[in-house]
Amino acid sequence: MNSKCKVLVVDDIHENIELVADMLKGLDVEIQKADGGAKAIELVDSFQPNIILLDLMMPQVNSWDVIKYVRASYDKSEMAIIVVSLLNNKDNIDDCYEMGVNDYICKPIIKAQLVSSVETHKENIVEPTPKASPTMVALHNKNHDNKAIFGM
């Protein structure tokens, strides 16, 4: 990855966002903050983070929705999701990995563990390859059909 790594910190508790952002100071990363799932989804499209640090327990648009949204458009190697959560039971952790999460950190957060995970995933991120939307596929097919009809 050539440009500065972009990290999106997502939690519904402001103090947790600030704590995580403070732990990342000193790393060569650009940080954006989201106070919930809806804002996170908005920033996935506009900010296009390389790494998302995501709390699991959020109201309204929850973390599962964010994970599904991200994985519908980005591969694990293109946009890493690191869950940071109080939920430390095996079923939750397994569910997260099955949904495409890259790493899982249990709260309370240990700075060395967080920094290590971010650094590891920062090194492994590849540039995203845009996935074709259904509209683009339809336009491509129509153009291909027109060329066949008109002998182009």
Regions found by a protein language model. Give the residues of each.
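Active-site beta3 strand of CheY-like receiver
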Residues: 47-53
